């Protein structure tokens, strides 16, 4: 059944399935928190610019299908793709098909989904093409009533300004709200980001803009606030008196896979650290907001970002992967072997930065951000490492407590602690209190990050989207070191494809009060 994708049909106390409960809540007009519902009976149109591209076929269209299939969109939702490529609906459908995960018993619903689609080919800078698009949207909506429109810009930065001007001048709904979803990159530095933000502010109100960072849609990232502020045992220790250091890690086991040309323009710092990892840091470190309203939360994120000094080169370790002669396939090729990358490129594929927060709660606690490609595993994890126990009586055998929030893969929350080894001796050992989602929540489906975020746009919740002042502070922190790296042509440290990364990164981590014991590996419950 289609509902198995979302909840496996688990029931609430009144007999509703969890999915039915969610659908009902989305249609409820009286909710305590902003952005938790939509008007199901008002027509909505979802317009995808860049509809023929990779992001659209791999993420956007599959996400829209999953939401449509599970009845999580307003009842009268239509979809329209727009790109330069001349495609029929059937050709567009064929491009997307392998990513849609359609089950045999969902075929009728899938046909219905595509019957609600249109597609228009046109340029991104010709006003006449946008006039034609407006006419197609009006025809698709086919009603003389109010209609809400969402515009998703899955586009390269080079066409961004012209497209947004044409949307504003020509394509907005006249009797309904309009919302614009924007994909990164949000500029290359503080200057280009401000230029883009000023341009958007001249066209749209901030409450119409949804700057998407898909990491903010991940289950464990969204869980950070609850972990912190709904548990006194953790909240009361969340400070410099108890926490020694924080390590936020993002690792990918693959290289650029022939797409290094795009990556080479931005590098790992802009691609991952300045956005995904810094957003996680802000949720870990921010003060308690006055409520769960989106702007109360984003206000606190901005406050903590303002307390972080700009990074310098001394705070960084930079690396670039080289081929592994003992590897197989792609592992034998280094970054510079990618034919789309310049032979003398100094672009880092690995970066580690140590950030400091100059406020009362975190003064002296290093926040270590590390990310890289072509490493030994796929993993995103937050490690909150506590200080050593004062007055040790266990002859140096006691290890630090550590709260570990595993973002991906295999969502989990576990707390590393010391216990007596079972048996007749009085030895101690490291173990964990473990909440592994796939075992504790067997009947629950964890939706893809894009599902959560696109649904948030329909509901009008900006809680998990980046505000312009957040973006400004992020670039203030990173622009000086990016300029220093590029102006001085800093050479990254070579590391072997499939390794942990440069050894210098582990040394820098140790210097910043994070102890890596290497004596214990979490494997999750069997």
Curated annotation (Swiss-Prot):
Its Gene Ontology molecular function terms?
glucose-6-phosphate dehydrogenase activity; NADP binding
Biological process terms from the Gene Ontology for this record are: glucose 6-phosphate metabolic process; glucose metabolic process; NADP metabolic process; pentose-phosphate shunt, oxidative branch
Key words of the record: Carbohydrate metabolism, Cytoplasm, Glucose metabolism, NADP, Oxidoreductase
Which Pfam family is one of this chain's hits? Answer: G6PD_C
- Catalytic activity reported: D-glucose 6-phosphate + NADP(+) = 6-phospho-D-glucono-1,5-lactone + NADPH + H(+)
Annotated localization: Cytoplasm, Cytosol
Q: Give the EC number(s) under which this enzyme is classified.
A: 1.1.1.49
- CC terms in the record's Gene Ontology section: cytosol
Q: Where does D-glucose 6-phosphate bind?
A: 184, 214-218, 252, 271, 373, 378, 408
Q: What are the positions of the active site? A: 276
Q: In which pathway does it act?
A: Carbohydrate degradation; pentose phosphate pathway; D-ribulose 5-phosphate from D-glucose 6-phosphate (oxidative stage): step 1/3
Residue numbers binding NADP(+) 2: 370, 379, 383, 406, 414-416, 434-436, 500, 516, 522
Matching SUPFAM superfamilies: Glyceraldehyde-3-phosphate dehydrogenase-like, C-terminal domain, NAD(P)-binding Rossmann-fold domains
**Residues the entry annotates as binding NADP(+) 1:** 50-57, 84, 184
Q: Which NCBIfam families match?
A: zwf
The entry's family comment says: Belongs to the glucose-6-phosphate dehydrogenase family.
What role does it play? Cytosolic glucose-6-phosphate dehydrogenase that catalyzes the first and rate-limiting step of the oxidative branch within the pentose phosphate pathway/shunt, an alternative route to glycolysis for the dissimilation of carbohydrates and a major source of reducing power and metabolic intermediates for fatty acid and nucleic acid biosynthetic processes.
- This chain belongs to the protein called Glucose-6-phosphate 1-dehydrogenase
Species annotation: Ceratitis capitata (Mediterranean fruit fly)
Name of encoding gene: ZW
């Amino acid at each position: 059944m289609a509902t198995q994708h979302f909840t496996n049909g688990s029931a609430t106390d009144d007999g509703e399935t969890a999915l039915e409960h969610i659908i009902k809540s989305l249609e409820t007009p009286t909710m305590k928190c902003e952005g938790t519902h939509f008007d199901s009976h008002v027509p909505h149109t979802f317009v995808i610019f860049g509809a023929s591209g990779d992001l659209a076929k791999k993420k956007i269209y599959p996400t829209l299908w999953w939401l449509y299939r599970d009845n999580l969109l307003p009842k009268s939702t239509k979809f329209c793709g727009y790109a330069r490529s001349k495609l029929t609906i059937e050709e567009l459908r064929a491009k997307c098909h392998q990513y849609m995960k359609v089950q045999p018993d969902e075929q009728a619903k899938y046909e219905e989904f595509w019957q609600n689609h249109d597609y228009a080919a046109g340029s991104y800078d010709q006003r006449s093409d946008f006039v034609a698009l407006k006419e197609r949207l009006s025809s698709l909506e086919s009603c003389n009533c109010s209609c809400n429109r969402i515009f998703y810009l899955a586009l390269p930065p080079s066409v961004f300004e012209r497209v947004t001007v044409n949307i504003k001048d020509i394509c907005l709904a006249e009797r309904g709200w309009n919302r614009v979803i924007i994909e990164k990159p949000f500029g290359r530095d503080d200057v280009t980001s401000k230029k883009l933000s000023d341009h958007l502010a001249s066209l749209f109100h901030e409450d119409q803009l949804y700057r998407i960072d898909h990491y903010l849609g991940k289950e464990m990232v969204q869980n950070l606030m609850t972990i912190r502020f709904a548990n006194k045992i953790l909240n009361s220790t969340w400070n410099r008196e108890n926490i020694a250091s924080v390590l936020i890690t993002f690792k990918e086991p693959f290289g650029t896979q022939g797409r290094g040309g795009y990556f080479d323009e931005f590098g790992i710092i802009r691609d991952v650290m300045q956005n995904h990892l810094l957003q996680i840091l802000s949720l870990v470190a921010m003060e308690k907001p006055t409520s769960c309203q989106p702007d109360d939360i984003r206000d606190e994120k901005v406050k903590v970002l303002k307390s972080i000094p700009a990074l310098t080169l001394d705070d960084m370790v930079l690396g670039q992967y080289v081929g592994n002669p003992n590897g197989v396939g792609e592992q034998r090729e280094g970054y510079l072997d990618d034919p789309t990358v310049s032979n003398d490129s100094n672009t880092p594929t690995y970066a580690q930065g140590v950030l400091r927060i100059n406020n009362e709660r975190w003064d002296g606690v290093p926040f270590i951000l590390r990310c890289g490609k072509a490493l030994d595993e796929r993993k995103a994890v937050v490690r909150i490492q506590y200080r050593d126990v004062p007055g040790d009586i266990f002859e140096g055998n006691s290890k630090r407590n550590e709260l570990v929030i595993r973002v991906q893969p295999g969502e989990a929350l576990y707390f590393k602690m010391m216990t007596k080894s079972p048996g007749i001796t009085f030895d101690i050992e490291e173990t964990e209190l473990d909440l592994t989602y796939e075992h504790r929540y067997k009947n629950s489906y964890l939706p893809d990050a894009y599902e959560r975020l696109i649904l948030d746009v329909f509901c009008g919740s900006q809680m998990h989207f980046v505000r312009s002042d957040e973006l400004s502070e992020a670039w203030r922190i990173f622009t000086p070191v990016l300029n220093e790296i590029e102006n001085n042509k800093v050479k990254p440290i070579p590391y072997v494809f499939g390794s942990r990364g440069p050894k210098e990164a582990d040394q820098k981590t140790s210097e910043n009060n994070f102890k890596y014991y290497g004596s214990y590996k979490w494997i999750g419950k069997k």
